[in-house]
């Protein structure tokens, strides 16, 4: 059974051929990957399934009406029978069975999450139940994909010509599984597969949801933001009162870090360490360093990551103050953040529902899901779930992690065992995606791989610790010694301590072990003030 693509639809009112070509173009635009483009051309080819077409028209077909595994089967046939065409279409891809298997898996799983490519239980990657249902359908329908692939690629592909060939292909799909990659390519391989999957998912949802115009608008906003950001930030800094001893020292440190990053950028560095004392103005320093990267390397999205919600709110307040009049470039995205435009549309919909407002609402949701704003303020959790994750909805953000500047403050809040691992991972990611990262801290954590971990050093073979932006001599400056510790040596009871604390006009902290004494001090405070 052959098919005419011009008679098949991917979504209501959208021709399948148009959808496949649109998604392929978008994927190539997102990643510049030939493999992503080819995968996208095949990802929904299984929608030629007559039962799927009936379902799309509102009927209730009685047979197999799925499409993703059918698409993967068609892709597998093409890869096995046309290795030379594949190499011509994807000249830069990994030359391995693992790469081909992973591409087939992406097609089969593009509506779900990116699966474990080497399952711990020894089972194949793909669902045996789904594969069995697919083969039962193929035994009845005898579907041919030759003319469909020819129309999409513009070339005549070879296809299985015997029952035996088809049997071998089916057996391969049923038992599909990867083998471990060599350590020296494993990380690059994983990042490539993750990138292809995320590009397909984003491109597919962009075309299906008709938000292509928003992608163009996001790109224009990013260029506009990058053009104005350095001047606006500099104007804000010039208006600050820098006459106090503390502010003079802050300015000195900031200028030193800027000179250092200029040198690092000239040397081709992409990941930097900003270790500076508490109170030295790291927020403005980080924003200034991002400005230098944009001036040197062109338009970049800024993703400002922080460990705690309370700090994201503080940074948002500071950034909005700097970018007054351009607040629409900035969006804080965490579990407590809000989008004022989103709230306004909801109110308008309640009063006067319209298709236009619904489309704008969907576009705003998509923009937030994909981190489509020029300046994002978010939590480490959101960043790590995307960088290290496999979830479909989280990987929607990953394409916008390319060509950006990560500002990661308070990096010491990570578990110490992850310091070296995460920075090495981030370093590799930045090198492959044209991104830059500045990790900031006041406590000087060791950002190196463990000396006794041979596997880690093989896995991150070319890792070097981040380029240091500041001398540690600034810690010796008394202007940053803002705390005094007074040890109470005499024995006093809780009520005496409570009275003593309340009499202090200025007190930063009172440290007690978290035990019954701490609870009694709290109870004393409640009795005193209700």
Residue ranges and their predicted role:
Residues 1-231:
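Accessory nucleic-acid engagement/destabilization modules that flank
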Residues 19, 237-275:
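Conserved pre-motif I regulatory segment
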Residues 267-290:
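Walker A/P-loop
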Residues 299-323, 331-338, 446-448, 518-519:
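Conserved Walker A/P-loop ATP-binding site and its immediately adjacent core
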Residues 301-312, 504-529:
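Conserved strand-helix element at the start of the C-terminal RecA-like helicase core
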Residues 325-388:
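Inter-Walker segment of RecA-like/P-loop motor cores
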Residues 381-383, 394-432:
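SF2 helicase catalytic motif II
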Residues 443-505:
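Interdomain hinge/linker at the junction between the two RecA-like core domains of SF2 helicases
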């Amino acid at each position: 059974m052959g098919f005419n693509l011009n008679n098949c639809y991917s979504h209501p009112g959208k021709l399948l051929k148009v959808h496949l070509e649109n998604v392929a173009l978008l994927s190539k635009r997102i990643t510049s990957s030939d493999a992503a483009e080819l995968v996208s051309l095949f990802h929904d080819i299984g929608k030629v399934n007559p039962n799927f077409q009936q379902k799309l028209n509102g009927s209730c077909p009685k047979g197999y009406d799925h499409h993703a595994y059918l698409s993967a089967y068609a892709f597998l046939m093409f890869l096995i029978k046309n290795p030379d065409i594949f190499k011509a279409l994807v000249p830069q891809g990994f030359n391995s069975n693992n790469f081909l298997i992973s591409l087939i898996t992406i097609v089969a799983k593009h509506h779900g999450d990116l699966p474990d490519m080497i399952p711990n239980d020894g089972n194949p990657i793909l669902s045996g139940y789904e594969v069995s249902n697919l083969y039962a359908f193929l035994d009845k329908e005898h579907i041919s994909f030759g003319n469909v692939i020819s129309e999409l690629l513009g070339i005549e592909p070879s296809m299985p010509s015997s029952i035996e060939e088809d049997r071998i292909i089916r057996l391969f799909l049923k038992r599909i599984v990867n083998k471990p990659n060599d350590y020296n390519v494993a990380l690059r391989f994983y990042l490539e597969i993750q990138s292809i999957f995320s590009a397909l998912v984003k491109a597919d949802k962009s075309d299906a949801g008709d938000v292509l115009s928003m992608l163009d608008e996001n790109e224009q906003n990013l260029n506009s933001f990058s053009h104005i950001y350095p001047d606006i930030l500099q104007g804000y800094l010039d208006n600050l009162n820098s006459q106090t001893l503390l502010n003079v020292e802050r300015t000195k440190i900031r200028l030193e870090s800027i000179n250092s990053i200029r040198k690092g950028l000239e040397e081709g560095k992409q990941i930097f360490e900003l270790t500076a004392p508490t109170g030295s103005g790291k927020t403005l320093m980080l924003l200034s360093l991002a400005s230098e990267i944009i001036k040197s390397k062109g338009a970049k999205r800024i993703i400002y990551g922080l460990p705690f919600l309370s700090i994201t709110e503080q940074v948002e307040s500071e950034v909005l103050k700097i970018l007054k009049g351009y607040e629409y470039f900035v969006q804080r995205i965490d579990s407590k953040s809000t989008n004022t435009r989103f709230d306004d549309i909801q109110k308008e919909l309640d009063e006067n529902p319209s298709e236009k407002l619904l489309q704008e609402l969907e576009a705003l949701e998509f923009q937030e899901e994909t981190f489509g704003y020029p300046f994002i303020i978010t939590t480490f959790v959101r960043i790590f779930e995307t960088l290290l994750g496999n979830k479909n909805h989280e990987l929607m953000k990953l394409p916008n992690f390319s060509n950006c500047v990560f500002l990661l403050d308070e990096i010491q809040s990570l578990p110490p065992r992850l310091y070296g691992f995460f920075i090495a991972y981030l370093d590799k990611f930045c090198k492959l995606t044209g991104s830059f990262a500045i990790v900031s801290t006041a406590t000087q954590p060791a950002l190196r791989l463990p000396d006794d971990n041979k596997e880690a050093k093989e896995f991150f073979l070319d890792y070097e610790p981040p380029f240091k932006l500041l001398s540690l001599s600034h810690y010796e400056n008394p202007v940053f010694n803002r705390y005094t510790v007074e040890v109470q040596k005499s024995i006093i009871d809780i009520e005496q301590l409570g009275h003593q604390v309340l009499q202090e006009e200025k007190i930063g902290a009172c440290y007690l072990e978290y035990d019954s004494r701490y609870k009694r001090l709290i109870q004393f405070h409640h009795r005193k003030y209700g």
